[in-house]
Regions:
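Non-heme Fe(II) oxygenase catalytic core, chiefly the N-lobe of the double-stranded beta-helix
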Residues: 1-244, 250-286
Length: 286
């Protein structure tokens, strides 16, 4: 079956049909999916089997994979895949007040080499919620007032793991804190593949804008965060079992919705292909 592409009527996203999870993707089909991801920032592939090996192979086609910072999330077969679950009937999930990921963030923005893409596969879906919100940060940047764009172009921001999870993130112990020191990234990121600019700050991990007074930094970030969460920039993805969703992490933010009453929501997550040529990124702070 030929690959089909249907863009979503949303700020991001396209559904890709014709993918057979029982077979390896041809180079032609993979490059088609890759181009759709670059163009639409989110790719939804429905009706795939729960095949860990296939999912890992798909992720590896995009580049190296990065294990989750917390080993307790690692899949029992491989650290390259994580199990992100929220069973609110269990003590495990109650380590955090909210389900994991229930805050706006960009995966690994707290690392020297942020993630290029994440891949989420649904195995358990509540019937009454548990959606994922995704914001198009290219459109967010382009819609900023010109005066504000002039202020932030060329500035950098400091990112820290655990900074702003608001009850949906496990605070790192001293060993993890030493392993992941604060990092600096440009406030406006240039996409290495497309050259498009996007806003690269997020409430989950961005501490401050550098080179400006603290109160001014806080005011700018509050304005940028509020702007990025406006409805016209966001897509709300409703999960179905067997869906694989690829997200271009370089130009989006995302968050899980903690709005469901049923106990279980479970996704398999692959985080991958950390580039080492992000313009302006990577100065470690000690």
């Amino acid at each position: 079956m030929a690959i089909g592409v249907e863009p979503l009527d949303a700020p991001v996203g396209a559904v890709v049909s014709g993918v057979d999870g029982r077979r390896s993707l041809s180079d032609r089909d993979f490059h088609r999916i890759e181009q759709v991801l670059l163009e639409h920032l989110v790719v939804v592939i429905p009706d795939l089997e729960d095949d860990v090996a296939w999912l890992l192979k798909f992720g590896h086609r995009f580049g190296p994979l990065v294990p989750h910072i917390l080993t307790r999330f690692h899949h029992p077969k491989t650290p390259e895949m994580s199990i992100i679950s929220a069973n609110m009937d269990s003590g495990e999930s109650r380590r955090t007040v909210k389900p994991a990921g229930a805050f706006w963030h960009s995966d690994l923005s707290y690392c020297r080499d942020p993630s290029d893409a994440i891949f989420l596969y649904a195995t358990h879906v509540p019937s009454d919620g548990g959606d994922t919100l995704i914001a198009n940060m290219q459109r967010v940047y382009e819609a900023l007032p010109e005066s504000l764009r002039k202020v932030i172009d060329g500035l950098t921001a400091t990112h820290r793991y655990g900074w702003g999870g608001k009850g949906a993130i496990t605070a790192p112990d001293p060993q993890r804190r030493a392993q992941y020191p604060d990092v600096v990234h440009p406030v406006v990121r240039v996409h290495a593949r497309t050259g498009r600019r996007s806003l690269f700050v997020n409430p989950g991990y961005t501490m401050c804008i550098n080179g400006v007074p603290g109160d001014e930094s806080e005011a700018i970030l509050e304005e940028l965060f509020a702007h990025s969460q406006r409805e016209e920039f966001c897509y709300r993805h409703r999960w179905a079992v067997g869906q694989l969703v690829a997200i271009d992490n370089r130009a989006t933010l995302h968050r899980a919705m903690a709005d469901y009453r049923e106990p279980m929501r479970k996704l398999r997550m692959i985080v991958g292909c950390a580039e080492r040529d992000t313009p302006g990124a990577g100065n470690l702070l000690n």
